[in-house]
């Protein structure tokens, strides 16, 4: 469903980090991969600091490797840039690729290093064998 009903509510709840609302909507059948009116999926607009929201979305089938059509950023790029190691680890465990570049040729590790997130950069280097 494009931008309506519980699917639109799911993106909003995910963006606000509302764990219980996300859980209720998913259990009621909301599509974890539905796009909102801006063309973004809940996993792309979720509050990156909420690893619980990420876990719920992924548990219900959210695609961890969905790319923004304009920037080619994926949720791992956002988590790395913003400094959310727990969320990044949840995404990686669910199959998110760490070796894909955004539209500017940057990997998640590049974004972590640019922002001074050393713990995330270490994790990404270790996870990719780099």
UniProtKB/Swiss-Prot annotation:
GO molecular function per UniProt: cyclin-dependent protein serine/threonine kinase inhibitor activity; protein kinase binding
ANK repeat ranges per the UniProt record: 5-34, 38-66, 71-100, 104-130
Key word Transport present: no
Tissue and organ expression note: Expression abundant in lung, less abundant in testis, barely detectable in liver, and not detectable in neonatal kidney, adult kidney, brain, heart, or spleen.
SUPFAM superfamilies given in the database record: Ankyrin repeat (SSF48403)
Any single GO BP term: negative regulation of G1/S transition of mitotic cell cycle
Matches recorded under Pfam families: Ank, Ank_2
Keywords, ordered alphabetically: ANK repeat, Cell cycle, Phosphoprotein, Repeat, Tumor suppressor
Listed GO CC annotations: cytoplasm; nucleus
Chain positions found as Phosphothreonine: 12
Subunit structure: Heterodimer of CDKN2B with CDK4 or CDK6.
Family, per entry: Belongs to the CDKN2 cyclin-dependent kinase inhibitor family.
Function description: Interacts strongly with CDK4 and CDK6. Potent inhibitor. Potential effector of TGF-beta induced cell cycle arrest.
Name under which the protein is recorded: Cyclin-dependent kinase 4 inhibitor B
Organism annotation: Rattus norvegicus
């Amino acid at each position: 469903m494009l931008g309506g009903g519980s699917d639109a509510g799911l993106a909003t709840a995910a963006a606000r980090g509302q764990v219980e609302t996300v859980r209720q909507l998913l259990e009621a059948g909301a599509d974890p991969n539905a796009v909102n009116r801006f063309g973004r999926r809940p996993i792309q607009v979720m509050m990156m600091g909420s690893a619980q929201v990420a876990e719920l979305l992924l548990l219900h089938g959210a695609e961890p490797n969905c790319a923004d059509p304009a920037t080619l950023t994926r949720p791992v790029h956002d988590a790395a840039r913003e400094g959310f190691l727990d969320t990044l680890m949840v995404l990686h465990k669910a199959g998110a690729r760490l070796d894909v570049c955004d539209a500017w040729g940057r990997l998640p590790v590049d974004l972590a290093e640019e922002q001074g997130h050393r713990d995330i950069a270490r994790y990404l280097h270790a996870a990719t064998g780099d």
